[in-house]
Amino acid sequence: MKALLILGLLLLSVAVQGKTFKRCELAKTLKNLGLAGYKGVSLANWMCLAKGESNYNTQAKNYNPGSKSTDYGIFQINSKWWCNDGKTPKAVNGCGVSCSALLKDDITQAVACAKKIVSQQGITAWVAWKNKCRNRDLTSYVKGCGV
């Protein structure tokens, strides 16, 4: 009985961790979801952004005390402007999506929201892109992935 309880807890912890993509797996997924070259942003730039924001982890979540908002998912999409978490004051929900949807292993909704953000504000909407990706050689993010 004790072994079943421990097994159950282990399985629960695995389920809560979410998916951390391998580099080439994410590159292929983002390409298949139409991000390669979307609004002039290369796949390598999207990969660098995802690495800098979440380390390719779909469950990444970071609270911002100043704005009382939270960043969600692989692209760290903010609850003040882009998604609804039910607790951020004066949230806009520009993507019309629940923030919990941005934490799913299936990143289709996260990509759709990222497309909306980049369409309206450009890739510079993400601080991690400005700090870690802009004006850098990003070829290593897609090298050897066959994309």
Curated annotation (Swiss-Prot):
Family the UniProt entry places it in: Belongs to the glycosyl hydrolase 22 family.
Tissues showing expression: Trachea.
GO annotation (BP), single: defense response to Gram-negative bacterium
EC top class named in words: hydrolase
UniProt domain C-type lysozyme: residue ranges: 19-147
Catalytic-site annotation from UniProt: 53, 71
CDD domains hit by this protein: LYZ_C
Catalytic activity: Hydrolysis of (1->4)-beta-linkages between N-acetylmuramic acid and N-acetyl-D-glucosamine residues in a peptidoglycan and between N-acetyl-D-glucosamine residues in chitodextrins
Functional summary from the UniProt entry: Lysozymes have primarily a bacteriolytic function; those in tissues and body fluids are associated with the monocyte-macrophage system and enhance the activity of immunoagents.
Keywords attached to this entry: Antimicrobial, Bacteriolytic enzyme, Disulfide bond, Glycosidase, Hydrolase, Signal
EC number: 3.2.1.17
Record has Signal as a keyword: yes
Subunit annotation: Monomer.
Protein name as annotated: Lysozyme C, tracheal isozyme
GO molecular function: lysozyme activity
InterPro entries tied to this protein: Glyco_hydro_22 (IPR001916), Glyco_hydro_22_CS (IPR019799), Glyco_hydro_22_lys (IPR000974), Lysozyme-like_dom_sf (IPR023346)
Taxonomic superkingdom: Eukaryota
